[in-house]
A protein has these predicted regions:
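Active-site pocket-lining/capping segments in soluble small-molecule metabolic enzymes
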Residues: 208-234, 284-336, 341, 371-378
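Conserved, mostly hydrophobic/aromatic
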Residues: 107, 135, 184, 254, ...
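N-terminal amphipathic alpha-helix/helix-capping segment at the start of soluble metabolic enzymes
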Residues: 88-106, 113, 378
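Active-site-adjacent beta->alpha loops and helix N-cap segments on the catalytic face
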Residues: 93, 117, 143-154, 173-179, ...
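Active-site mouth loops of central-metabolism enzymes
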Residues: 105-119, 164-175, 230-246, 324-337
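Active-site beta-loop-alpha junctions enriched in small/polar residues
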Residues: 108-111, 138-142, 166-172, 197-199, ...
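Short, Lys/Arg-enriched N-terminal segments with co-localized hydrophobic residues
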Residues: 55-90
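Polybasic, lysine-rich low-complexity intrinsically disordered segments
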Residues: 11, 30-31, 36-37, 48-51, ...
C-alpha cells in the first residue's frame, strides 16, 4: 500500500514538473534535463538554466503528502503492537470476580444471517453505554458461527468492555481449537468460556473429538496460551448427568484442570441455587461462581426453557405467567420485576456476581441496572 502511494506520487510530481518546464522554456536554447523523482530533489535555482523556484514548492508539497501517507500506514501497526482494549489493558475476568464489588454481565449471541452482523455490533455499543462489567458471546451450534462470534467479541473489547468468548469442543481437533485461540488473541480476547457443546440432534453417540470432556478443553487452553478460563455449571444438574453428585464431580474436574470461575445456566429458584452452592463448596470447589438469571418476557419462552431443562417451573414464576401471560407488556414488566427481585436476594445473601441472559435485548440490562443502580454501587 505504501509503495503504491510513493509510486503514484512520483509519477504525479514528474508530470507536473515536466509540464511546467514545457510552459517556461529554458534560455539560451538549452534542452531541459531528464527529470525524475530523485533528481528533482537536487535541482536549485541557478542562473537562467533552472526551472522557476515555485516548482520546488510543488515537490515540497509532494513530500508532505508522502510523509502523511507514511504516518497513516505506520499508525495502525504501532497502535496494535500489543493487544489492548481502548479502555486500557485487556482485563482478566477473574480479577473482577475476585473483588467484593457487585458485577453485572450479560450474554450475546451472533446473528444467523451475516447481513445482521451490524445490528449485533450496534447492540454491543448500546449495552456498553448502559454499562456492564463484561459481555459473553456464544459460539453457535458446533462452532458454525465462529467467525461472527469472534467479530462480535473483538468489537466488545474495542468498546472498552472485557469479552468472554464461548468455545465448544464437541467434534473438535486440537489444531482447529489452537487456530481459534490464535484468532482470539489477535482480536484482543483474553477470556474464554470452555464448553463441551450440545450433542447434535439425532445423535446417540458423541462425535469423535480430541476433547471428550470440557475439562480436557480447559487443560488444553491453559497449556496453549495466557487465557482466563471459565466453565458452565448447572444448579439443577446437567441433563445428561445421572445424579447431581455426578455433575458436581464433573465441576471439580474442570476446576482441577485450571478453570478460573464458573457461570451457571439460568435458574429461577434462588433456594435451589443456595443448596447447590452448599454442595459445591462441600466438594472443595472454591472458584468464583457467577449466578445466571433471565427475565421472562413471553409465556412460550417459559415453556420452552423448562421443557429443555426437564425441571418444574417454580410456583412463584408459574403464578406470574398464569396471571400476566395473555398480556405481553404486563408479562414483560412482571418478568423484569421477578428477575430484579432474584438479583436483590442474591446480592443480599452475598452472591455479588450476576450474569443476565438478555436474548440480545439491550433494554433488559439497561432496565436492571437503572432499577438496581444503588444496590450495584455497594
Amino acid at each position: 500500500m505504501l509503495l503504491w502511494c510513493v509510486i503514484a506520487l512520483q509519477n504525479r510530481v514528474t508530470v507536473e514538473v515536466s509540464a511546467a518546464l514545457s510552459r517556461e522554456p529554458f534560455l539560451y536554447g538549452k534542452t531541459p534535463p531528464s527529470l525524475n523523482f530523485s533528481s528533482e530533489l537536487r535541482l536549485q535555482p541557478f542562473g537562467n538554466s533552472c526551472f522557476l523556484p515555485q516548482k520546488k514548492n510543488r515537490i515540497f508539497r509532494g513530500h508532505i503528502v508522502t510523509f502523511f501517507f507514511f504516518i497513516a500506514y505506520l499508525f495502525p501497526l504501532y497502535y496494535n503492537r500489543d493487544i489492548v482494549r481502548e479502555g486500557g489493558p485487556a482485563m482478566k475476568i477473574k480479577e473482577l470476580l475476585d473483588s467484593p464489588k457487585v458485577t453485572i454481565s450479560c450474554e450475546l449471541f451472533p446473528p444467523k444471517k451475516g447481513t445482521e452482523l451490524q445490528n449485533a455490533m450496534d447492540i454491543v455499543h448500546a449495552i456498553a453505554i448502559d454499562g456492564v462489567d463484561y459481555m459473553s458471546v456464544t459460539y453457535g451450534a458446533g462452532g458454525t458461527a465462529v467467525g461472527k462470534s469472534l467479530a462480535i467479541a473483538s468489537e466488545v473489547e474495542r468498546s472498552g468492555v472485557p469479552a468472554l468468548a464461548h468455545l465448544t469442543c464437541i467434534g473438535a481437533k486440537k489444531d482447529g481449537i489452537a487456530r481459534v485461540l490464535r484468532d482470539m488473541k489477535a482480536g484482543g480476547i483474553d477470556n474464554v468460556l470452555a464448553l463441551r457443546g450440545d450433542r447434535p440432534q439425532g445423535m446417540d453417540e458423541l462425535p469423535e473429538s480430541d476433547f471428550p470432556h470440557a475439562s480436557d478443553l480447559v487443560r488444553f487452553i491453559k497449556e496453549t496460551g495466557d487465557f482466563c478460563v471459565g466453565c458452565a455449571t448447572y444448579p439443577e444438574g446437567h441433563p445428561e448427568s445421572r445424579t447431581l453428585d455426578e455433575d458436581l464431580e464433573n465441576m471439580k474436574r474442570k476446576v482441577d484442570a485450571g478453570c478460573d470461575f464458573l457461570v451457571t445456566q439460568m435458574f429461577f429458584d434462588n433456594e435451589m441455587f443456595y443448596n447447590f452452592m452448599y454442595r459445591l463448596l462441600a466438594k472443595g470447589v472454591r472458584v468464583p461462581v457467577v449466578a445466571g438469571v433471565m427475565p421472562i418476557t413471553n409465556a412460550k419462552q417459559v415453556e420452552r426453557i423448562f421443557t429443555l431443562s426437564g425441571t418444574p417451573i417454580p410456583s412463584k414464576l408459574r403464578a406470574v405467567v398464569e396471571r400476566f401471560g395473555d398480556h405481553p407488556e404486563a408479562l414483560r414488566q412482571a418478568g423484569m420485576a421477578y428477575t430484579t427481585g432474584q438479583i436483590m436476594d442474591l446480592i443480599a445473601n452475598g452472591f455479588n456476581h450476576i450474569h443476565v441472559y438478555t436474548m440480545n435485548k439491550p433494554e433488559v440490562i439497561g432496565g436492571i441496572r437503572r432499577t438496581l443502580s444503588e444496590v450495584i454501587k455497594l
